[in-house]
Amino acid sequence: MPVDKNLRDLEPGIHTDLEGRLTYGGYLRLDQLLSAQQPLSEPAHHDEMLFIIQHQTSELWLKLLAHELRAAIVHLQRDEVWQCRKVLARSKQVLRQLTEQWSVLETLTPSEYMGFRDVLGPSSGFQSLQYRYIEFLLGNKNPQMLQVFAYDPQGQARLREALEAPSLYEEFLRYLARFGHAIPQQYQARDWTAAHVADDSLRPVFERIYENTDRYWREYALCEDLVDVETQFQLWRFRHMRTVMRVIGFKRGTGGSSGVGFLQQALALTFFPELFDVRTSVGVETRSSQGNAGTAGS
């Protein structure tokens, strides 16, 4: 159908009798969603709307990310490798979206932000329940974080549930054990509330996988999927820190933290340390023995 006079006619099949029927806005509950942006500044500061929407949309993406990571854990428990890889691929794209979103907030100048910062009171992104929940799902577990949510018993209970359950990485290690890899017994049952720290006893397992990718392709592919997720998560953390630095400099955070300094510390946290450490040792012994053999025969 050609377009005439820069107008597009409605096609005959398009529904226009929508009284009492499910509509786009009704399905998405847009009346509730789009009425949730309520600036507190008086008169309303123009840029507070940007600040609110930035964080609300981030929380929506975090909700999806948590949904996908929980699914990945279930798939691993069921030994469903390809289904797990699918949701991890989606998780990576969600993190990319979250990372790129900071470019919108970066258009906020320091003076614009200071124009409404006081109305935020002690509220802070540090108090994002979903962010902490995702950290726990990925293995960055810190029981101290429960204190922040004492005001929200239901949310605190949800966070505690994730704290006390195996993380995504721990379920991956249990998956490897079921398929004959020499995972130490402690990873079958331990205090799941403790954060995972780098463990040299796991390195031979991953060296074997990374040095024999044809034989262990499924395991290798899952390792790389996890590396992708952590890399993208760290890029998001880094972009967050740089955006805060750009907008407020080195002022203290609204929630009482040191601000940029506190965010910088998060960049040193890791989810899957052995998957990065193994790259240092892969092939080293092989190359060393080959080099020694060559010297002896010369």
Curated annotation (Swiss-Prot):
InterPro entries assigned to the protein according to its UniProt record, in alphabetical order: Trp/Indoleamine_2_3_dOase-like (IPR037217), Trp_2_3_dOase (IPR004981)
Catalytic activity: L-tryptophan + O2 = N-formyl-L-kynurenine
Residues the entry annotates as binding substrate: F51, I52, I53, Q54, H55, Y113, R117, T254
Pathway linked to the protein: Amino-acid degradation; L-tryptophan degradation via kynurenine pathway; L-kynurenine from L-tryptophan: step 1/2
Swiss-Prot/TrEMBL GO biological process terms: L-tryptophan catabolic process to acetyl-CoA; L-tryptophan catabolic process to kynurenine
Cofactor note: Binds 1 heme group per subunit.
UniProt cross-references to SUPFAM superfamilies, sorted A to Z: Indolic compounds 2,3-dioxygenase-like
Top-level EC class as recorded in UniProt: oxidoreductase
Oligomer status and interactors: Homotetramer.
Entry protein name: Tryptophan 2,3-dioxygenase
Organism: Xanthomonas axonopodis pv. citri (strain 306)
Lineage of the species this protein comes from: Bacteria, Pseudomonadati, Pseudomonadota, Gammaproteobacteria, Lysobacterales
